[in-house]
Curated annotation (Swiss-Prot):
Its main location: cytoplasm. The gene is ruvC. InterPro entries: RNaseH-like_sf, RNaseH_sf, X-over_junc_endoDNase_Mg_BS, X-over_junc_endoDNase_RuvC. PROSITE patterns: RUVC. The RuvA-RuvB-RuvC complex processes Holliday junction (HJ) DNA during genetic recombination and DNA repair. Endonuclease that resolves HJ intermediates. Cleaves cruciform DNA by making single-stranded nicks across the HJ at symmetrical positions within the homologous arms, yielding a 5'-phosphate and a 3'-hydroxyl group; requires a central core of homology in the junction. The consensus cleavage sequence is 5'-(A/T)TT(C/G)-3'. Cleavage occurs on the 3'-side of the TT dinucleotide at the point of strand exchange. SUPFAM superfamilies: Ribonuclease H-like. GO terms for cellular component: cytoplasm; Holliday junction resolvase complex. GO terms for biological process: DNA recombination; DNA repair. Residues 182-223 are annotated as: Disordered. Pfam families: RuvC (PF02075). This is Crossover junction endodeoxyribonuclease RuvC. The active site is at D12, E73, D146. Binds 2 Mg(2+) ion per subunit. Belongs to the RuvC family.
C-alpha cells in the first residue's frame, strides 16, 4: 500500500524538554523533513502550568503543520519516580491534544525505533543521530538529542505504516470471514433443525394413522 504523502508528527515526550518533528513520506523509504524543534517548560513552575504550556505549544504545531498521524515514544523508565510521573503526565497531555483534533496516535518503544532506523535495537544516541541525519539528508545533526529522537520516531512510523495497514486489513478481513462463517453455520443449523422437526412431525403423523403391531384388533361383537 502506498503511503506517499503521509505526514507524520514525531514526539519525544518530556516535561522539561519535549522533542517535536514533522516529516513527510515520499516514494519507497524516502522521507522528507518538514520541521523539528523542542518545547521547554521551566522546572520551577507549577505542574499544571507546565502541562498547559506543553499542551498549547504542541497544539500549535499540530494546527500549523496538519499531520495525518502522531508517533509518540512509549517510555519505560526504571529510574527516578518523579521523572517517570512527569513523563507520564506529558504523554497524557500529548495524546489528549491529538484526540481533540481527531488525530490517530501510534506509540513505539525505544528499541522498536532503534531497530527500524539503524537495524540495531540497542543502538546508542550517537549512532541514531548519525543514521537519522543520513536518512533525511540533513546538512547537520539535529540538536538537542530530543529533536533527533522525535525525527527518528516520525521516520519509524513512515516505514512501519504500510506494514501496520496491511496487518490491520488482514485483521479486518479475518473478522469479516469469521462473521461470514458464523452466518453460514447459523443458516446450516437452522436448516438442519427445520428438517429434523419436519421428520419428527412426519413420523408422528405416520404413527397416528397406523395402529401398532402390538395392538389387538377389535373383536367382533359375538351377538
Amino acid at each position: 500500500m502506498n503511503h506517499e504523502g503521509l505526514r507524520v508528527m514525531g514526539i519525544d515526550p518530556g516535561l522539561t524538554r519535549c522533542g517535536l518533528s514533522v516529516v513527510q513520506a515520499g516514494r519507497g523509504r524516502t522521507v522528507y523533513p518538514v520541521s523539528v524543534g523542542v518545547v521547554r517548560t521551566p522546572s520551577d513552575a507549577e505542574l499544571a502550568d507546565r502541562l498547559l504550556r506543553l499542551s498549547q505549544a504542541v497544539g500549535e504545531w499540530m494546527d500549523d503543520y496538519t499531520p495525518d498521524v502522531i508517533a509518540i515514544e512509549r517510555v519505560f523508565e526504571r529510574g527516578n519516580v518523579s521523572t517517570v510521573m512527569n513523563t507520564a503526565h506529558a504523554v497524557g497531555v500529548l495524546i489528549l491534544a491529538a484526540a481533540e483534533r481527531g488525530l490517530p496516535v501510534h506509540m513505539y518503544t525505544p528499541s522498536e525505533v532503534k531497530k527500524a532506523i539503524s537495524g540495531n535495537g540497542r543502538a546508542d544516541k550517537k549512532q541514531m543521530t548519525v543514521m537519522i541525519t543520513r536518512i533525511l539528508g540533513l546538512a547537520e545533526a539535529p540538536k538537542p538529542a530530543d529533536a533527533a529522537d522525535a525525527l527518528a520516531l516520525a521516520v519509524c512510523h513512515c516505514w512501519r505504516a504500510p506494514l501496520l495497514m496491511r496487518t490491520r486489513m488482514t485483521a479486518v478481513d479475518l473478522e469479516h470471514r469469521r462473521r461470514q462463517y458464523q452466518g453460514k453455520l447459523g443458516k446450516a443449523k437452522s436448516t438442519l433443525n427445520a428438517r429434523n422437526n419436519a421428520q419428527v412431525t412426519g413420523d408422528a403423523q405416520v404413527r397416528a394413522g397406523h395402529p401398532s403391531q402390538f395392538e389387538r384388533p377389535d373383536r367382533a361383537d359375538p351377538r
